[in-house]
Amino acid sequence: MIELGLSRITTLLRHTPQSWKAIHVAGTNGKGTICAYLSAMLRASRVRSGRFTSPHLIDRWDCITIDDVPISSALFKEAEALVLKRNRDEKIQASEFELLTATAFEVFAREKIEMGVIEVGLGGRLDATNAMSSKAVTVISKIGLDHQSFLGSTLEQIAREKAGIMRPGVPCVVDSSNLPSVQKVIQDHAREIGNDVVLSSTDSAFLDELNPEDFEPSQWQNLACAHTAFHLAYTKPESPLHRLLPSIQNMSWPGRLQTLSIRSLTGRDGPVLLDGAHNAQAAEALRLYVDNRLRKADEKVTWVIAASRGKELQGILKPLLKPQDCVAAVEFGPVDGMPWVQSMPTAEITQAANKRGIDAARCYDAGGGNLASALQWADAAAGQGPVVVAGSLYLVSDLLRLLREADHVKSQFS
């Protein structure tokens, strides 16, 4: 169950000093990528940093990194045990996400970081991460429709919730590709609290050294946000370009336009594309990539799709699917530490695909938790054509976990 509010997390953090400055990142899409760019820049600049993003990728502790490296399970469990004890002793009744946030901040205190890159979990104003006492910069990425039952039914209402991460006197970087109405809401809130808004800009000597064609449009905007925020937060002498450039060129963010092999699962020679697009705006960005780089003329694309229960599925499928495509519907498994998250039944996904003009012969219902069979069907249906796995970050996690297990078994017998 999701319970927004700051009283429980504030109590939980009373004994965890925040000696580090935070770059706090909110938004609908692009938050994780911005955080990854920022971590890479801080590491290249030799700033000891931590990062906290959600959801986790494969294991619960991989959502917390120190100097861009996931922490060990031992460190995570030690910090978590202390947080759980405080929660019990003080009868706080904190939520799962509040406990995770407090665990991350406890790790950061122990590891004596200088700067923390913190991704908002949901919204901004009442999100547990907003209990931080010290922020250097806040960032608001692209705003889209998602989690409307918690944040509001319009972009402007959602923007107002995201703007709640601002602090007086702390600059706020805003993705300049946001709609004017969204920018106005954010700027109005900034004026109310006496704050400055800085629109992201792709005009800089740093970005001039990079080729925009090597990035998707959304990635380029995310990089502009990260670079703008970095230079507002980084108060040391200018970080040399020769150190920053490789950090950006080598940065990868799993589950976002990620190309990988599923040979160990299906025997497929060619790569598949993995993307966690789970709302209409993210699906449109994925469509651009698929149409420009994978789909040839009227060639079919084979999709493996899962979605969280309650998502507006037609909004996700409309940009992606064409009548000649094939769709394997699958459910992701239980999400560790997030019992309120449930997968949409596969029958709903195949029905939605049928409504997009894809006949039943081109759809496969893999049932609950049978990702391996969905991938095998997709491999056979695609032939030499492209395969894309999308619709949920939890599906991304399931696939990466399945690959890890397959590779582990393979290594035992090789």
Please state what every model-predicted region is.
Residues S19, M115-G116, A128-V139, I143-D146, ...:
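Nucleotide phosphate-binding/pyrophosphate-handling subdomain across enzymes
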